[in-house]
Amino acid sequence: MTYNNQIRAARALLGLSQGDVAALSGLSVPTVKRAEGQGVIAASSDAIAAIRAALEASGVEFIAENGSGPGVRLSKRKAGT
């Protein structure tokens, strides 16, 4: 499961704007804003998948909730390139 705070954190980690993420994912800026909103994510699962794929392709790894909570980090694969 991807959480809205993970999307915001991944975008910030990469230094991307909501417009950048929209362009990378092929979605609109309002859709990205809904995905990052507080509370329940108000974007479709397809939109979340597209955003996540775009952020992962840009060098972020999503960390599953494993007792310590969900998170994001820079991917080792991208960090060395």
Describe the predicted segments one by one.
Residues 26, 45-62:
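DNA major-groove recognition helix of helix-turn-helix/homeodomain DNA-binding modules
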Residues 7-20, 76-79:
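Short basic helix-loop element that most often maps to the first helix and adjoining turn
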Residues 9, 23, 34:
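DNA-binding alpha-helical recognition surfaces that contact promoter or target DNA
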Residues 60-81:
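Helix-turn-helix/homeodomain-like alpha-helical modules used for DNA recognition
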Residues 26-43:
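Recognition helix of helix-turn-helix/homeodomain-like DNA-binding domains
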Residues 12, 23, 56:
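Short polybasic/polar patches that bind polyanions
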